[in-house]
Amino acid sequence: MRVTEGGLEFEVPGESTRGVEASVFYNPRQELNRDLTVATLRAYERRNPHAESYLDAMTASGVRGLRAAADGWAVTCCDRDEAAVDLARENAARNDLEVDVRHADANVELHRSAYDVVDLDPFGTPMPFADAAFARCRNLLCVTATDTAPLCGAHFNSGVRSYGAVPRNTDYHPEMGVRILLSALARSGARFDVGVQPLLTHASSHYVRTYLELERKPTAADAALEELGSLSHCEDCLYREHHRGLIADPLETCPNCGGERLLEAGPLWLGPTCDPAFVAAVRDRIPDEFATANKGRELLETLEAELAVPTHYDQHRLCKEWGLPANAMDDFLADLGEAGYDASRAHYSGTTFKTDATVGEIRAATAESLSD
């Protein structure tokens, strides 16, 4: 079937498509992801004018890579599925775009050639491709992870195997996935003396997406590793505590309630997950013509204002724990501000927020309003 995206026309797998194997994948629900990719590339081009080449490492029908090519990037698309390669070539010709489409496994292609920007968008975990990407990506590494159950701790053993970390399925499980992924990528980069700086990261609709600026220097890799640490989480009162460093120092009892049902997670990325100035630059490069323009701008505005502290709270989950009705989020955050704490909405859902207050301090600051 034919679809239009970003002003281009593509043939993609569908019931009405003839001659296209079912193994070639196209997900219309990922249009926000692709729109943000284009806007991010536009912002990054301004940040680093020397970046020119872009690898779409798992191209499938070619939509993401061809949209980058339409913006002037020197694009290589590769896929190990021959039917996908054929379809990507047809779509390039259909849109009169000069793109190098190669029939190759992503790891093989990355070991063969270096690129300024590398985009990993696999089905499932990106970690089997991370080492090759860090070895051959010069500037910007774009990564999608769709295996959110392992990342967030719902499929614990799979998460440990894939990411070399202990994930926990908490009430802030989307952010757990974000920070487990960033930790694994930072550790992978460090093996190549590459440091990572997350410019934009979000958890949306059952996937995590991050854009990492790379610096090839041992001291940069060391600095990234210093952003790693562990987390202690109390299952009884939802208190959590973050500890920097690769050697965990777990709590024996909860400082807030005295409980002993504590979960430990890590290593996690405890540093910032976004650069607010870059996020604003991406937002400014979303045109009205994008189908997801309003949704994308709303997401980016929330990310720009989101506090850089780990980890978020869910207001409704806290109120349920306390046996109190939830009030308007703006009023809730205002109470925290009046009590002297920093607080912001978080992008994970409409009821999530971030603050530098502990769970006990949150309750003390908001209890009067919640009880009215």
Predicted regions located by residue number:
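SAM-dependent transferase fold signal centered on methyltransferase-like domains
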Residues: 1-372
